[in-house]
Amino acid sequence: MRTITTIAELRDALAEHRRAGRSVGLVPTMGYLHVGHMELVRRARGENDVVVASIFVNPLQFGANEDLGEYPRDLARDQELLTDGGVDILFAPGVSDMYPRPMETVVDVPKLGSELEGAVRPGHFAGVATVVTKLFNIVQPDRAYFGEKDFQQLQIIRRMVEDLAQPVKVVGVPTVREEDGLACSSRNVYLTTEERRAAAIVPRALDEAERLIASGVTEPAEIEKRVLEFLAGEPLARPEVVALRDPETLEPFGEISGKPVLILLFVRFGTTKLLDNRVIAPKSARFAKVA
């Protein structure tokens, strides 16, 4: 695997592959990789001639009181994992490489990006959309791979690509989970032993939402209320977002019918924010209907 830190060198390296007619897949990350990231790499490796992974902790998507300085980093470990995963090129620029001057241009998807997680992290998704657009411009991939764990982010990127006619296929990859169901995340390392134990309630809260839907509850507000009550059973859990939405538009709706439903959770444990979600098809919910 070749590690590249400058835009010019990366463009030169990719030009050779383009001239040879090879397809390029991009896996954008902020590093400190886990098995969820490696599933993105596995998908990219199986679907492209050349795989580029990027590691860049993007300051534009961190708020003033967020964990930019503390975000976990271990480039040597990440390089080893990516090499073992069959990545051809690692693009690992510094902030001065990506943003040599203060950014005057921002890409924003304001409607999708201002609700749910965006409501408690203002500006976050504009930072995500801006850096992803810049990576797309630099790499010009045929396909780009994102985890479904960050479902709102995935839908924002899909809408951005559609609106701007960016020539890339966005591939969503199902969430990879730990043994107790907790979604794999680089931020899981922040959890204390007690917080990690408590965090298992997050996937169980998704189970509770699915059980309620299977039992015939059709009012989103009632399901949200009961999921909040379920989370209240864990004293260390501080839910910030519990929302049922349309999985395509992320908009609220009046009543559950036969269409798929997105349940999205944003829960704090101490200083750590955990995201999770599930798309539930009411007619095929995994839990037996309650009489």
UniProtKB/Swiss-Prot annotation:
InterPro entries: Pantoate_ligase, Pantoate_ligase_C, Rossmann-like_a/b/a_fold. The active site is at residue 37. Gene3D superfamilies: HUPs, Pantoate-beta-alanine ligase, C-terminal domain. Homodimer. (R)-pantoate binds at residues 61, 153. Belongs to the pantothenate synthetase family. One of its GO terms (molecular function) is pantoate-beta-alanine ligase activity. One of its GO terms (cellular component) is cytosol. This is Pantothenate synthetase. Pathway: Cofactor biosynthesis; (R)-pantothenate biosynthesis; (R)-pantothenate from (R)-pantoate and beta-alanine: step 1/1. ATP binds at residues 30-37, 147-150, 176, 184-187. Its EC number is 6.3.2.1. The gene is panC. The reaction proceeds by a bi uni uni bi ping pong mechanism. GO terms for biological process: pantothenate biosynthetic process. Its main location: cytoplasm. Beta-alanine binds at residue 61. It is found in: Cytoplasm. Catalyzes the condensation of pantoate with beta-alanine in an ATP-dependent reaction via a pantoyl-adenylate intermediate. It catalyses: (R)-pantoate + beta-alanine + ATP = (R)-pantothenate + AMP + diphosphate + H(+). Keywords: ATP-binding, Cytoplasm, Ligase, Nucleotide-binding, Pantothenate biosynthesis.
